[in-house]
Structure formats: structure tokens, C-alpha cells
Amino acid sequence: MGPAMDEVTFKSDTVLSDVHLYTPNQRHLMVRLNGMGQPVFLSQFKLLWSRDSWTDSGAEDSGPTDVSTEEMPPAGSGSGHSHEDLSLQAGDDNTIQEGLSVPLDEDGDLDVVRRPRAASDPNPAEPARDKVHPTILAQEEDDLVGDQEYESCPHSIIKIEHTMATPLEDVGKQVWRGALLLADYILFRRDLFQGCTVLELGAGTGLASIVAATMAHTVYCTDVGTDLLAMCQRNVALNSHLTATGGGVVKVKELDWLKDNLCTDPKAPFSWSEEEIADLYDHTTVLLAAEVFYDDDLTNALFNTLSRLVHRLKNACTAIFSVEKRFNFTLRHLDVTCEAYDHFRASLDSLEKLADGRLRFMVEPVEASFPQLLVYERIRQLELWKIVVEPAA
């Protein structure tokens, strides 16, 4: 028998998600230390609901009002550009188009007006950078701003406990952009998730599962590691007001991609009952995975698990995977490559070509042009892939 997923050892420095990295001046509430002694933080992710989407979700009429176009980020835009920046750029374009005078340098090139350097900059020879001063709040301190926003509009706030920088084997304890992209897609494709049974593989903090449960009947939120699953269970409890609105139930369970069978030991935390296993195989129609394609061995294990599961399901199903194409310079190639992404794509190709006479797999990319209801940087390297699994003709 091979090793468990949480026993795989990676030799790497700590990594930090871009979701947490690009939140300058945000108040980070540290709530506790987890079982491994890692600080756990509480962050709030605001849903930019419109009146129509709020009504469709089944929430009460006391929900938020229409979201103005100033608050809603356009699909495909990053959170790093303010609307003031966009309006200034538009103004510059209009100035050029109208033929007004444009400042040029001695070579005839556009003379860009630079922002004045701060007097406190210790090294004026280096390029200027914005000062970032994140505030770490102790557990006993009150996050008044966040609490007031939550109390005024609780159905527009997702609360997630997470860690910050972790070793590579613990990256599931952070929130990643791929999970936010997947959550946006879930909110957009209500028809696919309404009243169904969903299985998320490698759920991490559980954000996508929580969003899915606002529409789905049952969501099996799975991963490995007691500490991670316990944090995921806490996040489900923190957002029970959201899932209760749609009547969905989130069940946090252990599912190890490196093992053939589900854990049914009643003494083990997050194990499966026989009834839950029967429900999983009898009713699941949607499978999810967000940002879990960073190690070739685990990617192989996930695709093996996917194949094993769908052959046991009674219904045709759709799998939605999110992935970020990350570029790294490697000494082996002496070039910039994205090996983890390339291996993921190769695995998709192999799956589509699989012919066992029982099932056929249809793979296609999902264009990320759907509305953005969560604030994050939707970069072009973020991708969604859909796998439709049907009985072979």
C-alpha cells in the first residue's frame, strides 16, 4: 500500500497565495493556532450580489441592494487597478484622439509624468513602490469594520479561516485564486448545481464547497489531514447562514487520492458511513477541483481517482477543474516553463483518449467571461476546464 496523501514530503520553502499576498493594508485577524502550531487567520470575502442574483438564491428581501457598476469588477480584470486609474487612462486616450497637445521628450516619445517619490523613501535610486502595512489583529481585539459590514449584510460575506505562508504540503490551508474563479462559475451556472449532489476533491479551506451548497442539495467536501479537515469544518460552520438559505448540506469527509477505498472506520474522524457512500455513488452529478495541480504525482493520483469514481457513479456527471498556469525558470531546461500545467494538460488529453467501452470523456475549456462576483485578480493564466462523462455509445 502506498503512502497517504498527507504523508508525501515536499522539499521546498514556504509559499504564499496571491490572494493573501495582494491584500495591502488589510486587517488580518489571527484567531488561533492550529494543531501544527501554525497561525490561523480569518478573512472575509464579499459577494457582489445584484438584486436579481440575490432573489434567485432564495435569500430574504432584506438583502443587499443592486450593486453599482463602480463596485462590480469587470470579468477578466484584476483587483490591482482602481476605477480612478481606469478613468484616467480613458481620459488620456480621449486627449490623444482629439489631437490635443501631448508632452513628448527630445526623441519624440511620449513623456510619461512620474508620480512624485515619497520623501521617506530610503533608497531614491530604486523604483518607487507602494508602502504596504498589513495589520495583524490579536484574537481579543475587535475587528469593528469587518463586524459592522458582516452584520449589515451577512448573506454577502463568506468567512474563511486559513493560514498564511505554508510549506508546499500544506498549501490547502490557504485560499487560492482558482477557488475564487471556480466559486464565480458556480454562482454563474446555477442550473448545473441546483438541487444536485456535488463532490469536491482537494477542497482545502472549503470555499468552493460552501458556495456550491447555496444551491446544491448535498456537497461532499473532501481532502486529507485531520488538521485541514477540522479547519474546513469550522469554515462550513462559520457560513451555515449561507448554506441554510438554499437548504444545502456540506459534509466534510476524508478522501485520499492515493487509496482505492474510502475510509469507513467509525473511530477515524471524517470517515464515511455506508449510507453516505451509497448516496455519493447514487446521486453525484458534479465533481469539482480547484488549484490542486502543482505536483505531477498528485495530479496522476487525482486523475486515477476521478476515473475510479466516475466508473462507480450511477449517473452521467460533469467535472469542473480550475488551474493556474504558473511559469518558473528551471535549471533542467534553462528556460521558463510551466511543467505542472503541461502535465495537467497531458493528463486531460490522455483522459479524453481513454476508451474502455464503458464511458467516454469529453474535455473542453470554459471561457472565463462570466461575471465576477468575488474580488480577486482574474488573470489570464487562470483557466477552467470541463469534463463531461457519459456512457459510451
Curated annotation (Swiss-Prot):
It holds the Pfam family Methyltransf_16. Keywords: Methyltransferase, Nucleus, Phosphoprotein, S-adenosyl-L-methionine, Transferase. GO terms for molecular function: heat shock protein binding; protein-lysine N-methyltransferase activity. GO terms for cellular component: nucleolus; nucleoplasm; protein-containing complex. It catalyses: L-lysyl-[protein] + 3 S-adenosyl-L-methionine = N(6),N(6),N(6)-trimethyl-L-lysyl-[protein] + 3 S-adenosyl-L-homocysteine + 3 H(+). Belongs to the methyltransferase superfamily. METTL22 family. This is Methyltransferase-like protein 22. It comes from Mus musculus (Mouse). The gene is Mettl22.
